[in-house]
UniProtKB/Swiss-Prot annotation:
Compositionally biased intervals (Basic residues): 1-11
Tissue: Expressed in vein endothelial cells. Isoform 4 is expressed in lung, kidney, spleen, thymus and skeletal muscle.
Annotated keywords: Coiled coil, Endoplasmic reticulum, Glycoprotein, Membrane, Transmembrane, Transmembrane helix
Membrane-protein topology: Single-pass membrane protein
Presence of the UniProt keyword Mitochondrion in the record: no
Gene3D superfamilies: 1.10.287.1490
Post-translational modification: N-glycosylated.
UniProt protein name: Inhibitor of nuclear factor kappa-B kinase-interacting protein
Originating species: Homo sapiens (Human)
Spans annotated as Disordered: 1-39
Compartments where located: Endoplasmic reticulum membrane
Record function comment: Target of p53/TP53 with pro-apoptotic function.
Gene label: IKBIP
């Protein structure tokens, strides 16, 4: 550009000098014009190159700006999505807060109705009934064991009395045979026979008394065992009925708990829970009635158990009495042996 300006400035100064040349040399003017046209072509190319460079720079700048704009658009869309998600979360949080408020209101209403306290009382009463039933079963097992031991003791006593009676009978027969053999002895032998007869009469009386006592004991024990078995069967039936009622109560309680847990935070379901609680009231009243009916039954069972204990003590006393009688029989047997020894000694002396 500086060269072009210098050439433009030098152009008019050299024009008057060139006019005589033009006039003198007419053939040299086209060469000068051609040389001036080559000077003008260089700035045009420079301008075109500069315009191309600027266009390329602008294109590159526009391309970078478009990339940045695309990135900004993506970020804007991501922000839109995040704002939508944030709005959805806010709506969910608002719904959860509303449900929480409703649930708190429902819990306050339920606390006002005191259903949970009634359910806890029901559970405690059911546990008490379970403990009562377990105690009754344990007492029944104890009674059965005592009955078996009684029957075993009675059989042992019967066997011992029969064996003792057989031994006494054999000994009496042996004594009678010995007395018959020694019938020709002196008055001492007669006195001995009289004493032996008296002893035999005493033994017969003792045997009769023992047989009577054993028969009375057996009859009374049989009657008592029959009554005990009847009472035990009745108690087992009552216990089974109580167990059935307990299972029914458990099933009802499980159903009610399932219903109570399935309640949600709507007014209609709250009303259903209220009606359910109103339905539970007569059932609780019926349960209280059943428990009030069970209490006299349990008292009767305790009285019967006390009677059984007294009967067992009486039987132990009777067994002790029988053992004393058996000891007396052993003493009588020892006396009979002594008499036999004396009779044998007298026969040896004779």
């Amino acid at each position: 550009m500086s060269e072009v300006k210098s050439r433009k400035k030098s152009g008019p100064k050299g024009a008057p000098a060139a006019e005589p040349g033009k006039r003198s040399e007419g053939g040299k003017t086209p060469v000068a014009r051609s040389s001036g046209g080559g000077g003008w072509a260089d700035p045009r190319t420079c301008l075109s190159l500069l315009s191309l460079g600027t266009c390329l720079g602008l294109a590159w700048f526009v391309f970078q700006q478009s990339e940045k704009f695309a990135k900004v658009e993506n970020q804007y869309q991501l922000l839109k999505l995040e704002t939508n998600e944030f709005q959805q979360l806010q709506s969910k949080i608002s719904l959860i807060s509303e449900k929480w408020q409703k649930s708190e209101a429902i819990m306050e209403q339920l606390k006002s109705f005191q259903i949970i306290a009634h359910l806890k009382r029901l559970q405690e009463e059911i546990n008490e009934v379970k403990t009562w039933s377990n105690r009754i079963t344990e007492k029944q097992d104890i009674l059965n064991n005592s009955l078996t031991t009684l029957s075993q003791d009675i059989t042992k006593v019967d066997q011992s009395t029969t064996s003792m009676a057989k031994d006494v009978g054999l000994k009496i027969t042996s004594v009678k045979t010995d007395i018959r053999r020694i019938s020709g002895l002196v008055t001492d032998v007669i006195s001995l026979t009289d004493s032996v007869q008296e002893l035999e009469n005493k033994i017969e009386k003792v045997e009769k008394n023992t047989v009577k006592n054993i028969g009375d004991l057996l009859s009374s024990s049989i009657d008592r065992t029959a009554t005990l078995r009847k009472t035990a069967s009745e108690n087992s039936q009552r216990i089974n009925s109580v167990k059935k009622t307990l299972t029914e109560l458990k099933s009802d309680f499980d159903k009610h708990t399932d219903r109570f847990l399935s309640l949600e935070g709507d007014r209609a379901k709250v009303l259903k829970t209220v009606t359910f609680a109103n339905d539970l009231k007569p059932k609780v009243y019926n349960l209280k009635k059943d428990f009030s009916r069970l209490e006299p039954l349990v008292n009767d069972l305790t009285l019967r158990i006390g009677r059984l204990v007294t009967d067992l003590l009486q039987r132990e006393k009777e067994i002790a009495f029988l053992s004393e009688k058996i000891s007396n029989l052993t003493i009588v047997q020892a006396e009979i042996k002594d008499i036999k020894d004396e009779i044998a000694h007298i026969s040896d002396m004779n």
